Structure formats: C-alpha cells, structure tokens
C-alpha cells in the first residue's frame, strides 16, 4: 500500500497516520459493556495489588509473562463473550495504571486506585472483518452467535478510507469510533519545517522560505468572547441555577466546536502551505507553565496539543525537547541573554536576534538531527542547514498569514 524504505540494517522506516471516525449504531450493547467495565475494574484491582514500590517510592507494575497469563485466565472465568476482549481489557488496564504511575512520579497523583466509570471496550483487529467492496464492518461479540454489523459505504468519509487498513475500534453504547491506518514514508518528504508554538502565533522556519508566521489572534478572540459570556453567567448561578447552567453548557459546547473548526482549517492550510514537509514541534507541557491567574487564562486559550494532534492526521510530525530553544545562539551555540522586547543577545559572538526566529530555527535544527539519526543520514533534503547569516538577522517575519475560513489556503497580510 505504501512505499517502504529500507535502511542499512534492513528496517522499514514508516510513519503511520491514524484516521478516526465516529459512526452511530442502535445495537443493544449496554449489558455487554457493563460486564466489560466490571472486568476492567477487576483487572485494575489485580494489577494494583501487585504493584511494588522502589526505595524512592516509584511504582513498578507487574509485567512478567507468568503474571499476565494468570491475570488473563482469572478474567476469563465466567466470561461469555469473545476471549479477545479480555486482551483489550488488560491492555486498557495497563494503559490507565501506567498513566497514573507516570503522574504519581511527578507529584500530580496520590496513591489512590483509578476506577473505570465509562462504558466502552477496545475491539482488537482479530474480532473485526472489513469488506472493502461492500463497505461492511463485522464485529464479533460472541463467536458464531452474536455480531455487530456496520455499513459505512454511505458515510461521508468512505472514499478516504476504502483502501486503508482498519485498526482498533472503540465500542460504546450508541456509537463506535473506527480507526484506519495509512503509512507515510519519511523519504517521500523533501523538507523540514521548524514550528515555534507561541501564545498568539506559530513561527515557522523553512530552509528556503525563511521565517514565516501564522497569526493565531482569531483563536484567542473566539475563546475570550466565550469566556466572558461564561464568566457573566457564573455570577447568576445562585439566582437561576438551572437556566444559567443550561446556558453555560451550551456556550462551552459552542466554544469547543468553534475551536475545533478553527484548528481543522489551520492544520489543513498549514499542510498545504508546505505539502512536502516534515513538521517539527516542541513537546510542550502546560502544567509547568502555570503562574498567576491572568497568565493561566492565557495559557488555557492556546491549544498546542490539539494542533499537533490534528496536523499529525495530515502529515509527518516530530516532537523535540523544548528546553532553551529560544536562548541558544544559532551561530555559535552559546546561551544568550534577553534584552528589551523580543530581542536576545549573544555575548560570545556579539550578535542580536529575534527570539521567535531563534526558537523556530533551533527547533528546525533539532528536528533535522533527529531525522538524520533515524534515517542514518539519508533520505531527507538537508537544504538550509547552513543558513545564510542574513536570514538569521531579519527582525521581522518574511510573510505573515491568517486562516481563511472560506478558502483552501492562508490569507497573506504582510
């Protein structure tokens, strides 16, 4: 289905894009999903009771094959459905507890056992039969007895996915989330673009186009307008609790939908701006950025993870360490000092730069280093690694774009 690049050690270098779609159904699954939830909590109990803690109080989950075999056999007792669902339940349990352990180490969680409350189950591909010609997906509930059949031939996304491989399915009471896998090749891409994610803009460094900026003021305006309306209604909760809460929930839903729509248009137009590029983003964590109440509101209005998630459906994305990207000199590599506004100064090579340009350029360089390490130094154009001195000294972006709500491409404003 895809071009496969062989490396020197005969490994295939592929990047997998997962597309997800929601399809409604009317099958009576509540009893089945309740049993799945009960088994999930039982599985979490068994793993939780076997967690061991190191001297530094770091939790270690039991992962031996013997333990997992006993766990599976125990969960299969009194189970009347396909046994492969138990494998999905075990996988989900480990995922939940690994997330808890990771947050516990950072001090974000206490020693409180997670409890599953939602009704859902992961369906392995071994329980799925996909007829591409008919557009029919058959999910086994009970082997040779009970099946859930979905026909997606008339769905709006069928033409996009009809030739793709179906992946894991999330089954809920009234809807299913279908995933389809598509493979991209690193060597199909000719350029690398570094993206510096800021509060009100995306600053991009392209080795040929230089410094480009995408203005995100409209995204902040959308969130700010709805935040003001919600804050006003919160003051009325004591007088009119039901009416105010109903309107607040409605505004939250509208806010969420408008933000989602903006991000979809932004990522589509961004991927069309540089269609042959690998995008390099910082692996940012908001939790470490919270300070004052006013600044927290600003941080809440950016959506870096949502942006990365949506653009990863459309092209190849790499995440790099964000540490010191805006303060390392692009010429000599020394740490720089901040001056007034967006200017940073290097006392070693005596040059001044714009902080945003330095940030996106250093992200570009880190992404290039990661690609070279992955690909053994081949397969991606390295044009622009030795960037001209003039490109790094520019005080302003070469081009500033904004999202066009009604078009396929960005609007240029400067």
Swiss-Prot record:
The lineage of its organism: Archaea, Methanobacteriati, Methanobacteriota, Methanomada group, Methanococci. In the N-terminal section; belongs to the transposase 2 family. In the C-terminal section; belongs to the transposase 35 family. Signal peptide: none annotated. InterPro entries: Cas12f1-like_TNB, Transposase. Keywords: DNA recombination, DNA-binding, Metal-binding, Transposable element, Transposition, Zinc. It comes from the Archaea. This is TnpB-like protein MJ1635. One of its GO terms (biological process) is DNA recombination. It comes from Methanocaldococcus jannaschii (strain ATCC 43067 / DSM 2661 / JAL-1 / JCM 10045 / NBRC 100440). Disulfide bonds: none annotated.
